[in-house]
């Protein structure tokens, strides 16, 4: 039963948007129940004396009246409300906060830039997979947080006075999207970054993760345009040229960019280009969570799981009553196959991880029905919350599960953008073979199999006499060989 004691709420009064996240604690992880976001653009109401206008304050209070209704069902100790950059700056912040507390019926805490950076990092550490040593970037409305860390521990924290709303007001006042506007915005951002760049570089990182609306917008653009999800400087420069070509902010049209995000997109883009250039970032991906998730996990006192993806897979297996022994059996066999062909097929470590994940989830469709189980599995993966996996990785997993058996839908493997199409094909082939040879659901009945790859030709060698003694197995592998040949995947079985 859902009781109010299992509910938690985190509210972030940001400089661009106000956000509310309501979650339920379920077996050591969180289940999102409500997410509300309203563009309040508080920072746009700051004048040259750092005084908030009455209109901006009213926009904020109006939004909080919406939030207040949802908070009535949640115990006050389980509500955390924080205010960030604009309310750190505003000389009349006290007036805004007093009324905000009255509306919400709970305290509002103005947090320091360093505390904001720490919470953002915690949110990322709890929800984002990948290497342990990371750089986290969050471009807010009036401040930008940059944090390095390993696992759950931060190694450096910086909160800088630049954001997509303040940069919009300062460098795109006339709403022109000219090269000069971008040049000035980038130059100013690099000057703000310069004093902290050495310290960040000293700590180093293996992966760079973006946790802001700007990065979310970039992700949406790249998914809509069929690009892979990695953000690179070349892609950012390409989007800048597109924006310049549009000429004015009100004319800005980029496939995948929503109207809601368009206003602060150019200013956020300029800041991000400056960060990439100044810190020599090669590639960035989108974080699974940030400030609000950091607040929630902080209230719950949950430890950071060393492997977020594994935790996610375990939770889903439990929820859909997956036969975990069989899932591990298929995964072990698929990894054994991958070990034999990875050099010839040039498969990277992430391919191994994604193949294993697909194996762990391949039978979740059975919880709906045996009929069309692959379609059910794909639907579930597409629509479940999978902390630790990026949107593109979710799409790849769903596509692999859709193609785990029966005729192969090659176009779906080519439409995902987590890995190159050829790699998706290779992973699909290995998954399908592992499922066939583990189908008896007993370790002692899995034969010794040798796989050899030569370009797209796959040669599968079985123990002598195995095919004669296993007529059903032979039928399955003959059918598989035929299905693979339909999509020009030669499979020879000996």
From Swiss-Prot:
Coiled coil: none annotated. Keywords: Hydrolase. Gene3D superfamilies: 3.30.420.40, Exopolyphosphatase. Domain 2, Hypothetical protein af1432. It catalyses: guanosine 3'-diphosphate 5'-triphosphate + H2O = guanosine 3',5'-bis(diphosphate) + phosphate + H(+). Its EC number is 3.6.1.40. InterPro entries: ATPase_NBD, GppA/Ppx_hydrolase, Guo-5TP_3DP_PyrP, Ppx_GppA_C, Ppx_GppA_N, PyroPPase_GppA_Ppx. It holds the Pfam family Ppx-GppA. SUPFAM superfamilies: Actin-like ATPase domain, HD-domain/PDEase-like. Catalyzes the conversion of pppGpp to ppGpp. Guanosine pentaphosphate (pppGpp) is a cytoplasmic signaling molecule which together with ppGpp controls the 'stringent response', an adaptive process that allows bacteria to respond to amino acid starvation, resulting in the coordinated regulation of numerous cellular activities. Belongs to the GppA/Ppx family. GppA subfamily. This is Guanosine-5'-triphosphate,3'-diphosphate pyrophosphatase.
